[in-house]
């Protein structure tokens, strides 16, 4: 999981990229599934705060996230993310870590961009982090990775005052599973991340100075 919470002037965004992975006996990626959640927050000069009502992930939104119409490939987000996941399959975590991207987070590799032109830097980093945290929990050869990324509804009536800032916290729950050819769950792990943006009385939105870690990463 890679989470960023940042603000600029009166606009802020929380972005969480997540990956579920299966590693084979040689430590190479046997399966990868990706998802991403983006939540935009804005502030007004009066201190009022606007938060999104739709808190679904990109994969969950499906055609409601209309990337295909704007894509030169005519592919939606899930199609491109799955292409990237397939591109990573068979590689080691170290090989994934070395995948180069440009200043916009996009790859220049011809094989990859033939089916995926979206920025992949956060997904690459999420896969690397997932590999670093991977544990033997019961998955077997041939099992597939699945991923669920769910955010709780955000408050719709927040406002900052001269005496008190407004805090927008996203409670994001993640579950990574492996399933066998019969659709049975063979392993599972859950996690949670709680990134937060702060809105001041003049509407300025700011993010935390420190990196955002999940509950599992924070440990005890």
What are these regions (language model features)?
Residues 2-220:
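Active-site- and interface-proximal helix/loop "cap" or "latch" segments in soluble metabolic
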